[in-house]
Amino acid sequence: MLKGKTVVLGVTGSIAAYKIANLASMLVKQHADVNVIMTHNATNFINPITFETLTGNKCLVDTFDRNFEFNVEHVALAKRADIFMVAPASANVIGKMANGIADDMLTTTILAAKCPKLVSPAMNTNMYENRIVQDNIKKLEHYGFEMIKPAEGYLACGDTGAGKMPEPQTLFNYIMRTIACEKDLAGKNVLITAGATQEKIDPVRFITNHSTGKMGRAIAENCMLRGAHVTLVNASVSVEPPMFVDVVNVTSAADMADVVKSKAAEQDIIIMTAAVADFCPSHPADEKIKKNDSSYESVIELERTEDILSYLGAHKANGQLICGFSMETQNMLENSKAKLAKKNADMIVANNLKVAGAGFGTDTNVVTLITADDCTELEIMDKSCVAAKIMDRLLKM
């Protein structure tokens, strides 16, 4: 997703500097051109050769390196950069950046850069909370820098509090959100449902299905990367939600219906990936049903749950897009086309549970995108790629 993108990582003197090697590796795996600039103090914590080995690029430390091919490298790299992240960012370098001091390769390059700039402070809690440091952070925010709030925990100095640099995965997510995709959903509100609802039989047992929420999560992440404000309504799921999305947790079909209906009017796009129960017990027991309890029959009486997709289709706002999912074991196209018309949806994503690589719990999917105009059959691919294809098709409607 980062092919053709130039990422500059500025590493300062902090014990957390070693973690940036992992971040650099993650970015390279996404085909980014990763360039690392280190302060001299940072080289006391991690060797520049580590970054050169991981990225395939020379690690820059000295502004006046006579052995390097660029005469004015700080300007050349600043022009090429698609994003500049300083992590870990010491109080010293934060102060320099906030006040326009350019006395080394890192501060000189970032002063010349016009790309998005992210800063991840890492220092002792008392240093981080010092009013001077906080003033410098506010000044950088005023100048358009995005500050990544440090985590709290046990610090290398022995103190406990704010000042820990977030884990590389978190920093990676910030970079991905900023430059991974064209922001063709900027300003749009997107609601996505995911996972399996649970319908209570008694306090111990419930009716559910095999949905894990992986497809819904993938779509939520894709929409977030494309600039949308995303609300993810999660039933029972086996995956963590992506960063930068609003998550609402629900249990039953009725819970999900209440949340979706309350938020539907403000959404530009609604995508119903959740496997919502069609039936629920009419009279769930307040106490656990015992096998030898003669007061309970062996038959559980069921009633239909509300059809959320039908409600959305009936109350669809002008310009709003509604996308449903169809899991079939036979007559997939016929049943899914009928569902599209009956529910007044704009698109149905259909998949056949019996096809290898499709369905619940897998990291891949095999789907057909069905609209009133056409059917597009996709080959087996990772669910993140399926998510991108779904959104590409919706945005053409």
Feature map (PLM): residue ranges:
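A cross-family phosphate/adenosyl-ligand binding-site feature
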Residues: M1-L118, N124-G213, R217-M397
